[in-house]
UniProtKB/Swiss-Prot annotation:
It is found in: Cytoplasm. It comes from the Bacteria. One of its GO terms (cellular component) is cytoplasm. This is Urease accessory protein UreF.
Length: 226
């Protein structure tokens, strides 16, 4: 990996990326309300479970395959698989989340003129666009490899979940850093599992997350949009 590719992925994984990630908890807040999360240890366990049991089987392998589609510029496969991912979201909140963040990232890519004109036209035609599809586009535009792209995406997800824990539990900054450090190995394992997953084995089945997300839609007091 070149320094330019590394910096591009650090940019994409940054919480400063203006796509609204900070406003979503992906069910974390609902799990807290259900008393599944109570402290730093249970927050770490919840985030670890989401990474190894959900992302590693669904979002990360999907991202890897979309990255390959962008490198090959297979517009038909991109559209078909993007539509499948959007349809796989199990609640209105989770669907709005991936659509809003995907749209914001796609707009950013277009405004910064990342990628060639033909691929930018394909990107613009994907409506709605899921976040992993847009993230894969941005990574492909910088010639990033699959392993580093997935690691950046997974780290950004862990960091955002940890940020939600700091605000909602609440936890201190040191407790949050301990969670991130504790999950470094899990990120590596999740990436390896995702890279070994063929397209027909991508699995987004996560009933507990779907139920909690649906409950969050009518939760009395909320900090986050999901």
């Amino acid at each position: 990996m070149t320094t330019t590719e590394l910096v591009a992925l650090l940019h994409l994984a940054s919480p400063a990326l203006p796509i609204g990630a900070f406003s979503y908890s992906q069910g974390f807040e609902a799990a807290l309300d259900a008393n599944l999360i109570r402290d730093a240890d249970t927050a770490r366990d919840w985030i670890a479970s989401g990474l190894t049991d959900v992302l590693a089987h669904g979002e990360l392998p999907f991202l890897a395959h979309q990255l390959a589609r962008w490198h090959a510029h297979d517009a038909d496969a991109l559209a078909r698989e993007n539509a499948w991912f959007v349809a796989s979201r199990e609640s209105a909140e989770l669907r709005r989340e991936t659509e809003q963040m995907g749209w914001s990232l796609a707009q950013l890519c277009a405004s910064l003129e990342w990628g060639d004109a033909a691929r930018r036209a394909t990107l613009a035609a994907l409506k709605p666009i899921a976040l992993p599809t847009a993230f894969a586009y941005a990574a492909a535009a910088h010639d990033a490899g699959a392993d580093a792209t997935l690691a950046a995406y997974a780290f950004g997800w862990v960091e955002n979940q940890t940020s939600a824990a700091l605000k909602a539990v609440p936890l201190g900054q040191l407790a949050g850093q301990r969670i991130i450090v504790a999950l470094r190995g899990a990120i590596d394992a999740a990436v390896k599992r995702a890279l070994a997953t063929p397209p027909d084995a991508v699995n987004t089945f996560a009933p507990q997350l779907g139920i909690l997300s649906a409950r969050h839609e009518t939760q009395y007091s909320r900090l986050f949009r999901s």
